Amino acid sequence: MGKIIGIDLGTTNSCVAILEGDKPRVIENSEGGRTTPSIVAYTDDETLVGQSAKRQAVTNPTNTLFAIKRLIGRRFEDDVVQKDIKMVPYTIAKADNGDAWVDVKGKKMAPPQISAEVLKKMKKTAEDFLGEKVTEAVITVPAYFNDAQRQATKDAGRIAGLEVKRIINEPTAAALAYGMDKKGGDRKVAVYDLGGGTFDISIIEIADVDGEMQFEVLATNGDTFLGGEDFDLRLIDYLAQEFKKDSGIDLKGDPLAMQRLKEAAEKAKIELSSSQQTDVNLPYITADASGPKHLNVKVTRAKLESLVEELVERSLEPCRIALKDSGCSSSEIDEVILVGGQTRMPLVQSKVADFFGKEARKDVNPDEAVAIGAAIQGAVLSGDVKDVLLLDVTPLSLSIETMGGVSTPIIEKNTTIPTKKSQVFSTAEDNQTAVTIHVLQGERKQAQMNKSLGRFDLTGLPPAPRGVPQVEVTFDIDANGIMHVSAKDKATGKEQSIVIKASSGLSEDEIDKMVQDAEAHAAEDKKFEELAASRNQADALVHATQKTLKDAGDKVTAEEKVAIEAAIKELEEAIKGDDKEAIESRMQKLSEASSSMAQKMYAEQAAQQGGDAGAQAEDAAGKPADDAVDAEFEEVKDGDKK
């Protein structure tokens, strides 16, 4: 059996590692680099990947694709995609299925196809080093990637000719890399992962359980559209504005100039991590009637920090939520690990140190830790490494839509995976022969506010009154965080299932706000829940009253029947509205209108039972029943209660 390689498929750079004996090793690419730019370029006669693609970007900006990971598993209409369209020199196009694809030389291509080119380069790098064919890999994804984005990453692996043995979360992989060579007691670590395009925070407990290293993720959170690329954009905007002030020329319409500006901004940002000031000098950036123009701007570290401070602050809110979800306070965190190239920025390091109240460790390579962790996980799967147990979690709650547009969770966020949970539901209408299972991901109580992952129908239910059929819905999440959903009619054994292969990702607003919105809108959600409960209660009352009215037949007077039917009509109208009080008052009215009918029905029932039981009652008069219990009651004063 060949080696299972570990690949960190990054937004900006990618990295590949293996386990040599019991030591992880990052493999250098053909250019000698330990990381490879995640850039793919299409020229007239070839496809370039990595450093060679990056080198020619200035002369070929519209066919050089970078930061494709930010599009993977996303819809074209997503806000973040629309924002990205304005920022990149290449063309983002709408696919037939509504996904965000790219258009290269008139040909539409899916993000997994582009990512597959980077994965092929990683695969070839490993094969050249090992001298043998590589067919299996563990690939990492941001912890906050949703189901669609994980699926798309798996697809990219398959396109690259790799069997993806496991998709694991980047912070978890980094914790594996950190924890494997650290002997010591149990500890809690916070992995702060700010990469090129995504941000994750995971709180992980590392414990020694009977000689086995156990890595348990307690909570995770993040933002899939926050990373180094955003820091670059702030600096690019600033440089373009400064140039416009000096020359009156707006560079934003010139892809060639913007590509040069992008490279210069990235270089300046890196330089400012170790120096206080740098010059951005771009001769012949453009020209007008008066001749060529040169860009020369001094940028200080303080200026860069003022441009990006809001982005760093934005990363702290997910940290707060992750701490809260894990049940830990910042003082209980033993170690802070920084992952991702953007964490080299002094401002990021100081803000994280202030937040957690301790300095982050400096012995973890932020560019390589994730790939090393993936390689360790690969060795665990192949059996080369034993005594390691990894317990990861699902980042967002998974639910189905139930009556009244309510999102009913089956699996809560931060549940350890793999996991399988079932819940029994029933029908909302009489003689309903089919149910639609609508699968959702997110934290809101209202179904429409969550991310729709897919839907399917379970048909062929035998006609029965509402509430009678028993439909068991099962959610099964595998170790890759990918979900299988099935629905089974318990009476007939009929079953329908779906592997959630949603083709879109969550937009920035959706993913960034899902958990935060759920908290901010707690009152709104509570109100909605109460309204939905009242509607369902009213619906049940209408159904029960109509059934009793039908059973009562001629025992109800014409006036009573008219009054009851009028009250039903009023209640049905109220159910359509959004006024909980109106629904409840109409329910009261219907209960009052139908009370005399109910009394007659009970009286008739009692009379029938009374006739049958009369003789027995006479025999039993004055005698206590055999099974009656004599009991003494003692009043307990409040002061005597223990």
From Swiss-Prot:
One Pfam assignment: HSP70
Annotated spans, Disordered: 578-642
Record's compositionally biased regions (Basic and acidic residues): 578-589
Biased composition (Low complexity): 603-619
GO molecular function term, any single one: ATP binding
Residues bearing PTM Phosphothreonine: 198
Cross-referenced Gene3D superfamilies: 1.20.1270.10, 3.30.420.40, Actin, Chain A, domain 4, Substrate Binding Domain Of DNAk, Chain A, domain 1
Spans through the membrane: none
The keyword S-adenosyl-L-methionine belongs to this UniProt entry's keyword annotation: no
Keyword Chaperone: yes
Induction: By stress conditions e.g. heat shock.
Keywords attached to this entry: ATP-binding, Chaperone, Nucleotide-binding, Phosphoprotein, Stress response
Similarity comment text for this entry: Belongs to the heat shock protein 70 family.
Function, as annotated: Acts as a chaperone.
Protein name: Chaperone protein DnaK
Gene that this polypeptide is encoded by: dnaK
